[in-house]
Amino acid sequence: MPKLFFALPLPTLAPELAAWRDRRPWPGLPVPEANLHLTLAFLGEADEATQARLIALAGQQHCPPFSVHLDQTGWFQRAKAAWVGPSEWPNELTVLARALRRHGEKLGLGNGEQGYRPHVTLSRKANEAPGEPPAPDFQLEADRFCLYRSVSTPDGVHYEPLACWPLRARPKPAAHPRPDANANAQENRR
């Protein structure tokens, strides 16, 4: 079964991030440019029926578009992953990540982690944190999120989007016209 995760795609930012990483000493094995994404929620393995239910739940999610400033580097020691991410991030990002993680939990998916650290993994098998390069300075304009599956091939792991949704605010309820007092009075006289 494939492993699933929700993420923000980086179609225009991925080439810039890869070029920035490749111009400096960076620990570990580089993540291919095509696999770069900002993780929202890791879900783990899921069968096709669970994938379909997850897609239906995610399609109901509302979140307005937002911006994220990627301005620091970091390292997950246990995962041996070196990354770039924001020092601060908008509440919309936290709310979206939490909601998507809960959708997975409803279906028995996820790893139960409650903390969220937005990041873009730039390398794996990193035995140390990135050095002190000039701080990253990238702006991510998030306008959609996707459900991906991880596919192992002879050339390595590739991430394939199963479904993507635009970020959009919750629609405002339609205003109902107030009943006309005169019309009500006339109705009452009949």
Question: Which sequence ranges carry the predicted segments?
Answer:
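Histidine-dependent nucleotide/RNA phosphoesterase domain, centered on the 2H-phosphoesterase fold
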Residues: 1-190
